[in-house]
């Protein structure tokens, strides 16, 4: 049978104490509101005593303190214990008064102090020794008659703890007044504990000056009740003299003898007439189940505190009960239970429970969870400490002084004992008397001294008073000054608040509010900036408007010609034409598109799938009479727009805009209106300045740029296998708006947001809705060409595309398809755009799209110049994820490439943003607000032409990307090599290069920073180091494999710890390196660890790249690592299959690393991406990382700090590089290498992975410990060979030897004769460069020289092999591709004009255009005669000393012939340099000086004339090409046949000559050229054949 327990404890069998009678098991519900016996509290608190009655215990003596009141009175005492004020002087008197609510089966518990003061100590104290849990000897089991008068011994004064606990002692020492004061003090403590103020009446009651009103009423009620009790007792004294003794025995008997009986009420104590009372609620507010109803002896039938007191005039219910049961009522008060026996009973039960609990805890099962087992062990150890605690408590209590108790503290003399005086004490008394006299004398003197001191103090006080008066005056003046300072501070705060408000409005782009605040402040600089902004934006607005007007005029001309051609074709009954004027061919892409048709009578329009295909249009129109082809409406104006040419531009633009705003396919007008309203609202919201400008009555810059807007609600039907996201549709709508408004732009979405898909969507949308079928030219990096092809195949398979790449033969095979025009998109790379411009530039491209457009950030780069010079593409779009990498001119270069008519001058653009106050003469330094204002106006300028969205803004579903920089240690080999390279710029060797093998040597290397980076990555990147170590470690072939690969490098050792963990948890890795030689070492390491990997670097072919991507991305791919170079593999690749990116060494340009990271962190990634950037501690890599972080911080501001501070020079940049190489104090605290646990936290995505990684580390350490030949993870110094461990003096000696050998040679050893002079003359070398056989020609010349010598080497073959192996000398130059014939001809014409110009006596020096035309026939002095060829260096040495770059016309003509000039600008530079050299060397006013000025102007005039001719020629070419395009198919075929016949007849003729012959017939200004027509034809023939061979 288990005892009842509380919900938190475990049930256990009933107690069985050792010897002596055992109490029976406790049956039924818990006997009272307290905790049940089995709980922890039951062990500490009171134990149930003898059988309890069924109603609560009455208060003895008086009913003034019911049980609930006692419980509430105990709360402040708990607060006293909690607040730590137990040592207070009133605490002792309060502790005995406040009692816990009594257990129904026993008396109220008391503190040990109270027990001690009552003259007894518990023989078995509580195990925990808590004062509030010590049991009281007074039991609630046996009731006390309530009629006991207060005068009798044992009468109880309410609230007296001593009287309550000791009924047999005398009257209490407390008077009623003291008790009232004590209650008031308890109430005061209670209120103070709650933080409440004390009322005045309570304060007086605490001091004993007045009693509380409630207490006075209680006194009166108490007196009345005592009188009633005395009367009742006197009435019952006579008949009740004898029965008390059996009743007392009957009450004590259960407590002393019968332990086996249950603790419920006994039958001899119960009566049938006792009413059942509800149990008193527990302190927690939860009522305990009521015990069973039981009869009660008459003496115990006193009502509890819950029964209301009867009025004085009515008989008490107690009297009525006693009258009914008068036959068994005792005559006098029955004696109470013996408290000692009750205490013993409680202790027995506690010991039995403890013993049973210990036994139960010792026998716990082994399958318990760890946390429960820990709790059980703690409990078992606590129970075993019980006897020790008991002994300790007894010793402590025995040593307590009795005068600390409440009773003895009040009467301190009660316990004094008289003491006999002895002789020794008498002597001591005399001694003390003498000391007393001495002390009195000392006090007298002290008093006199104090008197003197008081006089002096008065003097001090007098002075202090007057000083304080002066201080008050000072304080007053200081307060006035403080008031003024506070006022000034408040004004300053107000100014700052206004500035913050201004900044807030500026950041929120509230321009109207910002301008108002500027006007209030009267800030001249900010007002000037705003004025500049308005002027510049107004200027740009005008430029945009003019650009759009010019484009619209060109479009009108084309439309007019097309319309005219269409009418002619309609009259001649020609075949149907496409929208661009060309005839529709069944094999062309247009034949698959639906053509919109309309019914002539009903006006019904068929479009989309219902409309007929272009190839079946004629047959469909015959089968469906009444239909005709509907006029096009989207991008072109209707026929009425062509006819009304004099109509105002504004109205036509509004009509066009309305035409696009209102959806032509919707049927209800209300829908149209609603859409128009929404579109207008959208424009207002989208444009950050439209509201302000409309308020001022002018039109917004953005609104002017995007005047024609078109709503794009869904993607094209040609775009299949996927749906565009919302932000991608917005990007498509923005690009369509650029198309509609004849503008170009930059799509600069962050990497990974699908710029490729948006571009394909634009192409398909234009093909479907605008009938613009191309051709589209897409220029991409080689690494992404395969990805673009894959995306086109996936998203737009119906688009005909050509991948223009491969060998020259492969590219040549694509030319017929290019000429036929049966394609939509041409994909090619930057290199082929430059190389094959003579083929690709002949096609008139409709759209040019450049991927990774930041490649064109240099305006003078070859790609930009070739595209601008040779290619015709009116519409252009740049795609880039990083539009602003470094400086402002790079951004201008992009904008100038897109919109040259708007962004003309770089200097104006840069000056406007860099030095806004340069013209005003003020300081140029900008504060934060001015900087932000400039950034805002840059945004304002870029807004119509640049669209950029970030991942965090548009793609919230994308998982997180977390980057960690992991510091790596160096091996001993790395540290030594790094130290010497950093200090001296030398690399230690084993001396084999000087035939001192094993003795050591040093090799000086250039580009120290690069060598330091290589040492940080891996020391075996230096081949001689690896070969020497391979010999030292016993490896053959000079190649090291196995564990020594990662022991030599700290980064490799870190990878050796990380990669196995990532493979075990199925995390796939992209590993980016900067150096391909490092990738080779990495491959050896992967082979050692059996990691399956793929490698992609700059040498990987384009077709192989697509296969590698496919292998890695396929679902069940077995490849764990993809090894990529940062530059080749970091652009445009989709590698979402990996979720871990390791950047082995950081790039100087942080955007390269960001591009690399985003190969994995892009749309489609499902897992969290971890980027681990490895960095060697205390090395150059930390400086590179810091520089990269600085650049990234700059990029976040859009404009970097260098744009506003133009003070940095090349000297400062050199100093910065030098600072990187200087020694710095090592800061080991900052550069802590992470331990395994930190590393695991970085790479683990979940808690389970972290635990697995920790176990793997433990297994690795155990395995290393078991290995008898174990070595440390990193190479240590004692493993290094002797030649590498050198002290600084020896390294200095080796360095000096190296320098001496460079200067003096190697001493006695005969040096090999090496001829360092050029074996070839300059002509031979140039010819060899052209032919591409430089090495063979050099080798031939050397062999000829060698044959001439008498002492021929015995083994020349060996030397040849050695030389061929080393390939010393000038590297083979790449053969230059020839310029277009047209450009070469123009250059020759200009130079010949300048050379042949002759001076006439009757003409001014500076020629006009008319003079240039007739100068061929003029006679006079030829000005260029002196400039044709310069004198030699021997003839005129001073010229070559003064002029650094000499040049003459002969050299210029040679360069034209060798295609050194790529544009007329390059030619102009050399001609201007020639004239400038002449002006520098010759005196001003001399003949040559004046001739050079004339030749400058002649050159410029000739170039202008050539440019005008080119423009007129282009216009005529455009007209002819359009006419050719609009001819019928049969005519086109016949033209092709004629061209082929002409080619056969004129084998060497240029293929475009037949076309251009009519142009030559036109009258145009003739530039004099002394070459005859035959010579020109021969030159054109040779150039044409050259291009054909290409």
Swiss-Prot record:
Compartments reported by the entry: Nucleus
Position(s), cross-link Glycyl lysine isopeptide (Lys-Gly) (interchain with G-Cter in SUMO2): 1302
A Gene Ontology molecular function term of the record: ATP binding
Record field: compositional bias (Basic and acidic residues): 651-661, 1352-1363, 1542-1551
Compositional bias (Basic residues): 555-564, 1552-1563
Modified residues (N6-acetyllysine): 190, 604, 997, 999
Consequence when changing residue 719 to P: Found in a patient with non-specific intellectual disability syndrome; likely pathogenic
Phosphoserine modified-residue sites: 172, 175, 316, 329, 588, 591, 666, 670, 1377, 1512, 1516, 1528, 1568, 1572
Alphabetic keyword roster: Acetylation, Activator, Bromodomain, Disease variant, DNA-binding, Hydrolase, Hypotrichosis, Intellectual disability, Isopeptide bond, Neurogenesis, Nucleus, Phosphoprotein, Schizophrenia, Transcription, Transcription regulation, Ubl conjugation
UniProt-annotated stretches for the region Disordered: 1-71, 95-176, 212-334, 551-592, 627-672, 1344-1383, 1506-1590
InterPro entries reported in the protein's UniProt record: BRK_domain (IPR006576), BRK_sf (IPR037259), Bromodomain (IPR001487), Bromodomain-like_sf (IPR036427), Bromodomain_CS (IPR018359), Gln-Leu-Gln_QLQ (IPR014978), Helicase_ATP-bd (IPR014001), Helicase_C-like (IPR001650)
Compositional bias segments (type: Pro residues): 10-36, 101-111, 143-152, 278-295, 305-315
Post-translational modification: During apoptosis, cleaved by cathepsin CTSG to produce a 160 kDa cleavage product which localizes to the cytosol. Ubiquitinated.
Domain QLQ: from-to ranges: 173-208
Reaction(s) catalysed (UniProt annotation): ATP + H2O = ADP + phosphate + H(+)
DEGH box (motif): residue ranges: 851-854
Ligand binding (ATP): 749-756
Residue ranges annotated for the Bromo domain, each copy included: 1378-1506
One Pfam family, short name: Bromodomain
Keyword Translocase: no
Keyword S-adenosyl-L-methionine: no
Family: Belongs to the SNF2/RAD54 helicase family.
Reported disease: Nicolaides-Baraitser syndrome: A rare disorder characterized by severe intellectual disability with absent or limited speech, seizures, short stature, sparse hair, typical facial characteristics, brachydactyly, prominent finger joints and broad distal phalanges. Some of the features are progressive with time.
Complexes and interactors: Component of the multiprotein chromatin-remodeling complexes SWI/SNF: SWI/SNF-A (BAF), SWI/SNF-B (PBAF) and related complexes. The canonical complex contains a catalytic subunit (either SMARCA4/BRG1/BAF190A or SMARCA2/BRM/BAF190B, mutually exclusive) and at least SMARCE1, ACTL6A/BAF53, SMARCC1/BAF155, SMARCC2/BAF170, and SMARCB1/SNF5/BAF47. Other subunits specific to each of the complexes may also be present permitting several possible combinations developmentally and tissue specific.
Full protein name: SWI/SNF-related matrix-associated actin-dependent regulator of chromatin subfamily A member 2
Gene source species: Homo sapiens
């Amino acid at each position: 049978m288990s005892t009842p327990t509380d919900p938190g404890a475990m049930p256990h069998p009933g107690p069985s104490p050792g010897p002596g009678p055992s109490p029976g098991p406790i049956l039924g519900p818990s006997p009272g509101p307290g905790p049940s016996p089995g709980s922890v509290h039951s062990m500490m608190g009171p134990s149930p005593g003898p059988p309890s009655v069924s109603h609560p215990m009455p208060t003895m003596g008086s009913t003034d303190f019911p049980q609930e009141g006692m419980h509430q009175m105990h709360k402040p005492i708990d607060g006293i214990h909690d607040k730590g004020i137990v040592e207070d002087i009133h605490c002792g008197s309060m502790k005995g008064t406040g009692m816990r609510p009594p257990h129904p089966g026993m008396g109220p518990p008391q503190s040990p102090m109270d027990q001690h003061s009552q003259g007894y100590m518990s023989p078995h104290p509580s195990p925990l020794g808590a004062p509030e849990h010590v049991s009281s000897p007074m039991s609630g089991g046996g009731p006390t008659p309530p009629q006991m008068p207060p005068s009798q011994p044992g009468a109880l004064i309410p609230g007296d703890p001593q009287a309550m606990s000791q009924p047999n002692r005398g009257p209490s020492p407390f008077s009623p007044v003291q008790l009232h004061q004590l209650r008031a003090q308890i109430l005061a403590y209670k209120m103070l504990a709650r933080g409440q103020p004390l009322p005045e009446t309570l304060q007086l009651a605490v001091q004993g000056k007045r009693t509380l009103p409630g207490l006075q009423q209680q006194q009166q009620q108490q007196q009345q009740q005592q009188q009633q009790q005395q009367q009742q007792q006197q009435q019952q004294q006579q008949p009740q003299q004898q029965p008390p003794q059996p009743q007392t025995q009957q009450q004590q008997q259960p407590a002393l003898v019968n332990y086996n009986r249950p603790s419920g009420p006994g039958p001899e104590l119960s009566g049938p007439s006792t009413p059942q009372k509800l149990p008193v609620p527990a302190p927690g507010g939860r009522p305990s189940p009521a015990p069973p109803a039981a009869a009660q002896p008459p003496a115990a039938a006193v009502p509890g505190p819950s029964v209301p007191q009867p009025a004085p005039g009515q008989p008490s219910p107690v009297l009525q009960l006693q009258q009914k049961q008068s036959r068994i009522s005792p005559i006098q008060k029955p004696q109470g239970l013996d408290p000692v026996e009750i205490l013993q009973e409680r202790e027995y039960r506690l010991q039995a429970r403890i013993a049973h609990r210990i036994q139960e805890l010792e026998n716990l099962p082994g399958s318990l969870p760890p946390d429960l087992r820990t709790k059980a062990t703690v409990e078992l150890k606590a129970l075993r400490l019980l006897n020790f605690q008991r002994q300790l408590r007894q010793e402590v209590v025995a040593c307590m002084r009795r005068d600390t108790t409440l009773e003895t503290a009040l009467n301190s003399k009660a316990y004094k004992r008289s003491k006999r005086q002895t002789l020794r004490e008498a002597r001591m008394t005399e001694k003390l008397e003498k000391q007393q006299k001495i002390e009195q004398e000392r006090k007298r003197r002290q008093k006199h001294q104090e008197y003197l001191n008081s006089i002096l103090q008065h003097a001090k006080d007098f002075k202090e008073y007057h000083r304080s008066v002066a201080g008050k005056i000072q304080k007053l003046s200081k307060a006035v000054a403080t008031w003024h300072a506070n006022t000034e501070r408040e004004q300053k705060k107000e100014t700052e608040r206004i500035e913050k408000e201004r900044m807030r409005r500026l950041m929120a782009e509230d321009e109207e509010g910002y301008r108002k605040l500027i006007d209030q402040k009267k800030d001249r600089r900010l007002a000037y900036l705003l004025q500049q902004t308005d002027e510049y934006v107004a200027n740009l607005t005008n430029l945009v408007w003019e650009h759009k007007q010019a484009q619209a005029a060109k479009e009108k001309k084309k439309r007019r010609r097309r319309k005219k051609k269409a009418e002619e074709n309609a009259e001649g009954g020609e075949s149907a034409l496409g929208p661009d004027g060309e005839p529709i061919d069944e094999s062309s892409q247009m034949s698959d598109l639906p053509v919109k048709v309309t019914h002539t009578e009903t006006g019904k329009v068929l479009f989309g799938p219902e409309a007929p295909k272009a190839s079946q249009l004629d047959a469909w129109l015959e089968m469906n009479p009444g239909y005709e082809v509907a006029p096009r409406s989207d991008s072109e104006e209707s026929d009425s727009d062509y006819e009304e040419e004099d109509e105002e531009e504004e109205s036509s633009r509004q009509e066009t805009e309305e035409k696009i705003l209102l959806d032509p396919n919707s049927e209800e007008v209300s829908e149209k209106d609603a859409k128009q309203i929404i579109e207008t609202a959208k424009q207002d919201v989208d444009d950050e300045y439209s509201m302000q400008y409309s308020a001022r009555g002018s039109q917004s810059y953005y609104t002017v740029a995007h005047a024609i807007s078109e709503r794009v609600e869904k993607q094209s039907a040609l775009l299949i296998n996927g749906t565009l996201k919302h932000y991608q549709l917005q990007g498509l709508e923005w690009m369509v708006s650029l198309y509609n408004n004849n503008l170009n732009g930059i799509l600069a979405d962050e990497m990974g947001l699908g710029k490729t898909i948006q571009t394909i969507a634009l192409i398909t949308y234009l093909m479907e809705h605008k009938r613009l079928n191309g051709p589209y030219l897409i220029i991409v990096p080689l690494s992404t060409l395969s990805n673009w092809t894959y995306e086109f195949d996936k998203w737009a398979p119906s688009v005909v595309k050509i991948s223009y790449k491969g060998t020259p033969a492969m590219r040549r095979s694509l030319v017929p398809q290019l000429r036929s025009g049966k394609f939509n998109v041409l994909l090619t790379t930057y290199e082929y755009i430059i190389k094959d411009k003579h083929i690709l530039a002949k096609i008139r491209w409709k759209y040019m799209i450049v991927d990774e457009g930041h490649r064109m950030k240099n305006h003078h780069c070859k790609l930009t110049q070739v595209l601008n010079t040779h290619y015709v593409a009116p519409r252009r779009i740049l795609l880039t994820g990083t539009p602003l990498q470094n400086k402002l001119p790079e951004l201008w270069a992009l904008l100038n490439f897109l919109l040259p008519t708007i962004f003309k001058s770089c200097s104006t653009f840069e000056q406007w943003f860099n030095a806004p106050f340069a013209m005003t003469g003020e300081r140029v330094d900008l504060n934060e607000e001015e900087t932000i204002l400039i950034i805002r106006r840059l945004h304002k300028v870029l807004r119509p032409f640049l669209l950029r969205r970030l991942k965090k803004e548009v793609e919230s579903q994308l998982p997180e990307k977390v980057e960690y920089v992991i510091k790596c240690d160096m091996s001993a080999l790395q540290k030594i090599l790094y130290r010497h390279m950093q200090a001296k710029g030398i690399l230690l060797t084993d001396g084999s290069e000087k035939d001192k093998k094993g003795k050591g040597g040093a090799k000086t290397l250039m580009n120290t920073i690069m060598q330091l980076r290589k040492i940080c990555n891996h020391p075996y990147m230096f081949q001689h180091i690896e070969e020497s170590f391979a010999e030292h470690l016993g490896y053959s072939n000079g190649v090291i494999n196995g564990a020594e690969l990662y022991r030599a490098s700290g980064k490799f050792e870190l990878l050796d710890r990380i990669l196995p963990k990532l493979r075990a948890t199925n995390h796939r890795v992209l590993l980016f390196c900067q150096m391909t030689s490092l990738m080779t070492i990495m491959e050896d390491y992967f082979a050692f660890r059996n990691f399956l990997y793929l490698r992609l670097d700059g040498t990987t072919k384009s077709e192989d790249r697509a296969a590698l991507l496919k292998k890695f991305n396929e679902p069940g791919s077995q490849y764990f690592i993809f090894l990529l170079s940062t530059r080749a593999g970091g652009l445009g690749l989709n590698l979402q299959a990996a979720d871990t990116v390791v950047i082995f060494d950081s790039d100087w340009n942080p955007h390269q690393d960001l591009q690399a990271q985003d190969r994995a962190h892009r749309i489609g990634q499902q897992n969290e991406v971890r980027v681990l950037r490895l960095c060697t501690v205390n090395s150059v890599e930390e400086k590179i990382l810091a520089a990269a972080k600085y650049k990234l911080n700059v990029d976040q501001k859009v404009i970097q700090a260098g744009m506003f501070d133009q003070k940095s020079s090349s000297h400062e940049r050199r100093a910065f590089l030098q600072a990187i190489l200087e020694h710095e104090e090592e800061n080991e605290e900052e550069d802590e290498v992470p331990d395994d646990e930190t590393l695991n936290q970085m790479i683990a995505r979940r808690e389970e992975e972290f635990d697995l990684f920790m176990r793997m580390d433990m297994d690795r350490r155990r395995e290393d410990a078991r290995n008898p030949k174990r070595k440390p993870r990193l190479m240590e110094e004692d493993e290094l060979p002797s030649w590498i461990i050198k002290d600084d003096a020896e390294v200095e000696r080796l360095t000096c030897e190296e320098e001496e050998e460079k200067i003096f040679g190697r001493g006695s050893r005969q040096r090999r004769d090496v001829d360092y002079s050029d074996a070839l003359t300059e002509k031979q070398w140039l010819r060899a460069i052209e032919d591409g056989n430089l090495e063979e020609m050099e080798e031939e010349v050397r062999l000829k020289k060698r044959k001439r010598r008498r002492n021929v080497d015995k083994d020349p073959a060996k030397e040849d092999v050695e030389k061929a192996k080393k390939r010393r000398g000038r590297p083979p130059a790449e053969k230059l591709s020839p310029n277009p014939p047209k450009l070469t001809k123009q250059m020759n014409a200009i130079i010949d004009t300048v050379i042949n110009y002759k001076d006439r006596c009757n003409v001014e020096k500076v020629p006009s255009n008319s003079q240039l035309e007739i100068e061929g026939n003029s006679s006079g002095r030829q000005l260029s005669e002196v400039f044709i060829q310069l004198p030699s260096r021997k003839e005129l040495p001073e010229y070559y000393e003064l002029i650094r770059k000499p040049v003459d016309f002969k050299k210029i003509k040679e360069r034209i012939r060798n295609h050194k000039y790529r544009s007329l600008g390059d030619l102009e530079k050399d001609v201007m340099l020639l004239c400038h050299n002449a002006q520098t060397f010759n005196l001003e006013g001399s003949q040559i000086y004046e001739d050079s000025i004339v030749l400058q102007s002649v050159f410029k005039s000739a170039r202008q004339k050539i440019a005008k001719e080119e423009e007129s020629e282009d216009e005529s070419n455009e007209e002819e090409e359009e006419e050719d395009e609009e001819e019928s198919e049969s005519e086109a075929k016949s033209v092709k046949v004629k061209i082929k016949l002409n080619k056969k007849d004129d084998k060497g003729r240029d293929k475009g000559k037949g076309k251009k012959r009519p142009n030559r017939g036109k009258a145009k200004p003739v530039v004099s050229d002394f070459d005859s027509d035959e010579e020109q034809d021969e030159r054109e023939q040779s150039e044409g054949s050259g291009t054909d061979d290409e």
